[in-house]
Amino acid sequence: MTITGILKLARLLRLLRVLRRIEQFAAYGAAVLMLLMVSFTLIGHWLACIFYAIAYMERPHLPQPIGWLDSLADKYDMPYLANDTMSGPPIRTRYITALYFTFTSLTSIGFGNVAPNTNAEKIFSIFAMLLGCKSLV
């Protein structure tokens, strides 16, 4: 083995140290990515609950059934009845629809198939879009 071969071997050992360091940073990056995904999901859940609560609280006070809950009920052909709190689409469908809306608003995709119709829903949507822009920056 020559001296140049030994020097090249020392460089190879340095490269292995660099690779180990990169692996440590990759594990850190995966943890940060997981934390971001969990926090984004939690924020989306909270916003979906708020979006549903706005529509649910506002529904009895609207002169016409124009909220997103009423649009969803029309789409599923399951109308809300006057004195029946269990009428309308199943709660699972309402939650998934609200969650879908908040994620499309937070990520600024906004397909528009679930849309805010009342002023309160529109104000909430503006807030969700601004929050989504802030979280992406």
Regions found by a protein language model. Name each.
Residues 1-10, 32-44, 48, 84-137:
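Pore domain of cation channels
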Residues 1-4, 9-82:
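Pore-domain transmembrane helices of cation channels
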